Amino acid sequence: MGIDVAGLPVIDVHCHPFLDRGELTADDFTRLTAFGGVDDDWLPAGGVELTDAVRDELRRFRRDTAYHKRMVADLAAFFGVEPDLDAVLERRNAAVGAGYSDYVRRLFGDAGITGAVVDFGYPQPAIEIKPIRAQIPTEIVPIYRIEPLIVELLASDIGWDEFRRRFDDTIANALTNRGYRGVKSIIAYRTGLDISPLSRTPDQGYLALDAIRRGLGGGSMKKLRDHLVCRSLELCMEHSVPMQI
C-alpha cells in the first residue's frame, strides 16, 4: 500500500543563501539555473578564448543541462504557461517586480517548503544572515561551514597554537553570538570521509600544519582537515548543536 507524501511539509536541509537579483535576462537565468554548466571564468583560466562561437556553444550546453530544463518545466507549470524559456522568464520577472518576497512565498508554498537549513559557506564572500531572513519568508536555520575558515587560517602566517585558538573561537562565536545553529563540513568533496578517530588528537593538527608550512606533503592537508572535522564535532557537542557532513 502506497503512502501519499505530497501534502507533507518540507524542510530543505541542503541549500545556500540567495538574494533578490531583480529582473533577469535569458542568459542571466540560464547561468543561474544550469548547475554544472561551466562558468565563463574557467575557460580563459584554461587558455580558451571566449569568442562569440564559444559563448554560443556554452549557451546551448547550459540550456541542455537537466537542472535548467527542470527549472523551466517546473516554473512553466507554476505560472501556467508553455515550457518555453522566454515565456517563463516574462512571468518570473513580472512576479519579482510585483514583490520578491511574495513571489518566494508562493514558490515555497507550492512546493510545501516550511523551513530551510542554510549553508552560508557558499557563495563567498559570505552573505549576512539578516538580509536573507528579511527577503525569504520561511524559517531560516543557518549553519557554519568550516572550509572558508580553514582557507583563511592557512593564508595567515600563524603557528599551530594560534591556528587552533582562532579556529575554536571563530566557531564558538558563530554559534553563540552570530545566530548560527549548527556546523557543516564538505570534507567529502575535499579529502574524503575515511577519517580515523585518532585524528582528534591535537598532535595530529600540529604535525600536519607544520608539514604544510614546510611544504613536505605526505598527506598533510588531509591530516589537518581530518583533525579539524573531529575538533568541529567536539565543539558541536560542547554547544549542543548538530553537524552536517
Task: Identify the function of each model-found stretch.
Residues 2-236:
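Metal-cofactor-binding active-site regions of metalloenzymes
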